[in-house]
Every structure is written in structure tokens, then in C-alpha cells.
Amino acid sequence: MREYKRYWLALVAVMVVCFSILGYYGVEVYRNSPPVVNFTDENGKVVIDKESIYKGQEAWQSIGGMQVGSVWGHGAYQAPDWSADWLHKELVAFLEIKADEIYHLKYADLNAEQKANLKVLLKKEYRENSVKDDKFVLSADRLKAISQVASEYAALFGDDPKFKSLREAYAMKENTLPNASDRADLNNFFFWSAWATATNRPGSEATYTNNWPHEPLIDNVPTGENVFWSIASVVILLAGIGLLVWFSSFYGKKDDEKLEPISEDPLKKLNLTPSQKALKKYLFVTLALFAFQILIGGFTAHYTVEGQEFYGINLSAYIPYSLARTWHIQASIFWIATGFLAAGLFLAPIINGGKDPKFQKLGVDLLFYALLFLVVGSFVGEYLAIANIMPINLSFWLGHQGYEYIDLGRVWQIILFVGLVIWMLLLLRGFAGGFKNKGDKNLLAIFAMSAVAVGLFYGAGLFYGQRSPLPVMEYWRWWVVHLWVEGFFEVFATASLAFVFVSLGLVSKRFATFQTLASASLFMIGGIPGTFHHLYFAGTTTPIMAIGASFSALEVVPLVLLGAEAYEHYRLQFAQSWAKTLKWPLYCFIAVAFWNMLGAGVFGFLINPPISLFYIQGLNTTPVHAHAALFGVYGFLALGFVWLVATYLFKGQEFDENLMKVGFWGLNAGLMLMIVLSLLPIGIYQAFASLEQGMWYARSAELLQQSHLQNLRWLRMLGDTILIIGGICFFAQLLKFMFNKKA
């Protein structure tokens, strides 16, 4: 322990300080959320009450929420951002009403001076905050404007034939929300979300969403703080890179211990335990869900060009875009998590001296069947909610929460959390035997801690409720999406790989321990407070922006050395004479390093500075980062774990080189083509539109249905097809292992 004392102290200090920051400013998120108030007319009559806004939030959740457009920039990209769209339409309606009232002309027919006068009135009407006694007074003209937008939205979310082509452009099914009273509540929720984007915080010149979205009509432009912290984030990034290169050059640990030649793979000498043999079905489910996810992903992408049809067949009444996208995202979380679960459960008996703890196989089997129940149950619940079969009051619990990546109903979410805790306990039972052994146990300690973090921190997603304010929900949602996945999964992967490579005699334990402890500190110092970079415009204050921009810049710092990490993984296959049998798992880990650098590093920083995200939040630049980071990093990690475990579960069998080459390179090439041929150019085009005209236009059908953007979406099919072929080849390889007589 003494040898690693500085590293442990650094890790503990990082965790304490960073979680203190995250917790302290989390309290600020609660305190400073935009208020849900009663809206009255000038006579004091309540025209939009708080209860109807909350009911509207529930109705929005039940139809898929963030899977049907977005609110405050978070959600899907085909339909509009409803808060930006509502705001712009209401502003335009208000200007027309005032132009007619004052000048008896249409707004377009006014001269420059008249337009300027109306814009002064508009900004005063919308930016001033007059909340008093939990009430906000709406003028008669503003109520007329609200009524016009509400009528349009009610028709859009119903089945009015005049809006059919627009529903197709937005990839919305007919009668998205059939009940008229529910649509009225939904309108009130969308109005409130737009109101928060236009209304200044008390004592501030910025709105509740830090002036997002960009809307020139009321001077919703970046604040001075936005620009300052954007510049600061770049400076912090450069300083961090310089310090990292300096310290890694002068003080970085090198693996200078000479490895003892080993004639045979040490793990292949071990007899598989019953619990390890039971993991074959985990590998099957991992790749089966992966195959399903990429197929439904291609299906979902096709909706962006045909809206309600799949090559002329109208499937939107059965599997609409919102449901297909929900399943696509939910399946990705399930299969990646299952791959990680399998890796941990495989290593537990090895750590325990090559034997199962008591009833370990029973625990592994029960966990597997609970996983199947969870997947099927949550998918059915999401279908019933979006199909409007499940009552809205049950949807949050059994159907669809409406929040991206945590779409599954709360009951299913609790089952998933319980399953992760059971997995954690199964691992710790195996780790307990390892702690009884003599020798250096520092690597095992960090491995165990990462397993506990993976098991417990998903529970953060249970801390918000059905009616929680959106900023509060976003705070806890990103604890799961950012901190649980991007933080603790990363540490768990690093620790588990280090343990495997040490067990195989490919690296020294001392070097692996130093590297794992140092990596954990680097991941966490930026990753924990960096969670706030998702909340710049989610109804939070300037300190949240400052913390998020500063610390999330540090997340990119360790990624600059990933070229060296990729080389180290490549070199491992030559470390021992037999190590070439690990070629394909190692290639997957090389891919992880590449996509971590590009997807998390380059594409991640593209949307990281506040000034950048102000204009491109919710555009197609976001799925560029999401696909490259989630699949490119964590997907390939899970696939690497699958092939690593499969190497030992299917002893005596060899990889089919043709299947694996097509699979590996197909997945990488397909992902790259999807990004460079379609998502990235569309995102860049939208960014210019957002800069010049506003967020509403960048997300509008008017822009996205232009022929050249349609062609770019069709081009995505090339990358999608190659990626799907690669995924099917990987699945075929596993089936070949499983049904080979030698198995």
C-alpha cells in the first residue's frame, strides 16, 4: 500500500472534492429551477394553472417525451425543439397582432422603424419577469398569440388532415395524443417551457435557460458569462494537456519489469466453474440485443426520410418513430451493460482461486432470467404507453418515463437497479476470496470499488419523480448517463482489463496498478463536476455553466494519450508467444482507444464549450458525439469483453477470420461513414442556420426537408448497411461458437 499511497490519496481527494462540488451545486439546481406558476389574465382570472402544466408534463412523458422532438434541446432531432418552436411562433403571432392593432398592417409590410418599435414592445412583454405571489400576468394580446399556437399544436398532435404532411416531416404518427383535454394540458406544458426560455431570472438580464434558444426577435443571444467560460474552457484544456504530457514524460510509470516467458495461456489451464459455463447465455443475449439494436436503428433512421413509412409500408401506427428510437436507445444500454456484467461474473471465480462461491451459479442464472424479464417487460410497457393503450397515470411507472436513456418505466428501472446490486454482490463474494490471499491487493481493491460504483450509482436515476422540475430531472438523469456510464463504467473497464492482463502475464501487476489508479483520478477529476456541462441551458444558473465548462474540458485531457494506449493494446498480442489468440478482443480495445479519442475527445469537445452548445444543442452534431462515444467506446468495450470471455468459454475453437474481419472493420467503417456522410454534414448545415436565424429554424421542417438534406439522410444508409453487416457477422461468430460440436 505504501508504494501506491500518493495515488490512493490523490484518488480519494479527487472523489471527495469533486462529489462535494457536484452535491453543493446540485442543491443550487433545486433552489433555482424555473418556477411552475399560475398564469392569469389582466383581470386576475387563472387561464393556465399549475396543475394543468404538471398534467401536460405527464402527457408529454406518456407519448415518449424526449423521443418526440425535444424540450430545452434535450431529446430527439427529427421533430422540432418544442420550446424553441413554440416561442418563435408565439413571438411571430404577437408581432402580427400588434402590427394590426397599432399600424393596421401586416408585420411584413411595416417599415424598419415600425418593426423596431414593435420589437421593443415584444422584448418588454416577454423578457420582463412579473412573477408575484406565485402568479404571472399575461396581457390580452399575448393570450391571443398563445391561443393561435395552441390551436396549431392541438391539430398537429391529433389527426387533423391539414397537418398530415407536417407530421410526416416530424416522423410523428397520426393521433400522437388522441384525447383533446390531454392535448390542452400538453400545450400548457410546452407554453411553460417556452416561457422559461424567454423570461429573465429575477435580478438578472439572462433568462431562466441562460438565453437559450438563440432567438434574435427578443435578443436571446449568448451572455457575457457564456463567452467568458467558453474561452476559459479552451485555456483549461490546453493547460491540462500540457501538464499531462509534462507529468507523463517526467513522472509517468513505465512497465520496465521483464515479463517471465509463459508457454501457455494461464487462464486456459483453469477448469471452468459452473457459474462461468452459465455465462454463454449472457454472451448470446448481448449480441442478440446488439443485432436487434442496429437493425431497429436502421429502421429508425429510415423514418427521417419517409416519416411514417418504411419503403412505402405505413408502419407508424404500430411501431412509430418514437417507439423505434426508444427501443434503439434502450437496447444499447441493455446489451452494453450485459457485456460488462458477463465480464465481471467471469472474473469473480478466477479471483476466488478458480472456484465458485456457494450458490454462485444459482445467482448467475436468476440474474439472467431477471434480465430477460426486464428487457421484455420494459419494451412492452413502452409500446403500450406510446400506443395510448396504457393510462397516462400509469405510464411513468410501467410504460415510458419520457426521458432519453432512462425511458423505461420506474418499476422496470427499480428492477434494473436491484439486478445491478445483485450483480455487485455476486462479484464481491468472489472478490472476498481474493482479499484473503497474500500479496499486493491494490489492483483488486480499485476493481472492487469500481464494481460497487457500477452497482450503486445507477440508483441516482431514482431520485427524481414524475412531476419533478425539468432541471432536477436533468441533474439526476445525467448522473446516470454521464457519471454512471462515462465515469464508473470507464473505471470498471480499466480495472478489469488491467486485472485480466496481469493474470495473463502480459503486464506487470505493479505497472497495471499505477496505471489504473492514475487513470481513475484523471477520469473522475473532469468527469464528476463535468456532469454539469449537460445542464448549461436546462434551467440552471451561471455557476453551473462555469463548473461544467471548466471541469468537462479536463475530461478531454487524458484522451490525447489514447494513441499510446492503442499501441500498448496492439503490442500485448506479442508479449507472449500464445497471446495472438487474443487478437480480436485486443482489436476491440484498440477501437475503444480510437473512438475515445475521436468520439469522446474531438466530437465531445465540439459540443462542450457553452458558446458552441448555445447554437448547436439538439442539432445533428449531438448524435455524432453520441454514436461515436457510446457505441465507439462502450460498445466496443462490451464487444471486447464478449470475445475475451468467449475465448475461454469455447476452448479449442478458433475465430473465423473472415467473419471477424468483416465484422470488426464493418462496424468501424460503417460508424465512420454514418458520421462523415450524413450526421456531421447535416449538423454543420443546421449550425449555420441556427447562427443566422435561430434554433427554431435549424430544427424546422422548412430547413430539414430541403432536398440536399434529404439526400444526406439517404446517404446514411450506406454506413448503416455496412455497420449492420458487421454486427450480423459478429453475431454469426458467436452462434458458430455455440453450436459447434466442440463447444
Regions found by a protein language model. Name each.
Residues 1-49:
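Post-cleavage N-terminal segment of exported redox proteins
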Residues 1-7, 219-224, 268-279, 404-405, ...:
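Short, Lys/Arg-rich N-terminal segment immediately upstream of the first membrane anchor
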Residues 8-28, 60, 68, 203, ...:
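Hydrophobic cores of alpha-helical transmembrane segments in multi-pass integral membrane proteins
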Residues 31-227:
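Soluble extramembrane regions of membrane proteins in the secretory/endomembrane system
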Residues 41-44, 309-323, 615-618:
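Perimembrane loop-to-helix junctions flanking transmembrane segments
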Residues 91, 256-269, 442-445, 695-698:
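Juxtamembrane inter-helical linkers in multi-pass membrane proteins
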Residues 253-279, 355-358, 572-582:
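Membrane-interfacial, low-structure loops and terminal tails that flank and connect transmembrane helices
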Residues 401-410, 439, 472-482, 540-551, ...:
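Non-cytosolic membrane-interface motifs at loop->transmembrane helix junctions
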